[in-house]
Curated annotation (Swiss-Prot):
It comes from Brugia malayi. The keyword Repeat does not apply. Keywords: Ribonucleoprotein, Ribosomal protein. This is Large ribosomal subunit protein eL42. One of its GO terms (molecular function) is structural constituent of ribosome. Belongs to the eukaryotic ribosomal protein eL42 family.
Length: 105
């Protein structure tokens, strides 16, 4: 389990050019546009008779995705993305573990 704090003091490569506080969120893929060239080509190819025209990918190899942190500078609002390692469980701003304490569920 990876636990990342909601704020982080790191270098801002926008206007600030110095270490500032950044607000951390997890990157999420946006909604795909129906007007993108590949999507338009695929839709026109699929039209009419002839069934599925392109192969549907079924040989999935990975069980996890790489976590990408999206950091926004609190001063100039410049955003940057930071990929971290693969993990099955990711937590943002969870409780910090303390030494010698019993874990409660």
């Amino acid at each position: 389990m990876v636990n990342v704090p909601k704020t982080r003091r790191t270098f801002c490569d926008g206007k600030c050019r110095r270490h500032t506080m950044h607000k951390v969120t997890q990157y999420k893929k946006g909604k795909e546009s129906r007007l993108a060239q590949g999507r338009r080509r695929y839709d026109s190819k699929q039209k009419g008779f002839g069934g599925q025209t392109k192969p549907i990918f079924r040989k999935k190899a990975k069980t996890t995705k790489k976590i990408v942190l999206r950091m926004e500078c609190t001063e100039c609002k410049h955003r940057k993305q930071l990929p971290i390692k693969r993990c099955k469980h990711f937590e943002l701003g969870g409780q910090k573990k303390t030494r010698g304490q019993v874990i409660q569920f």
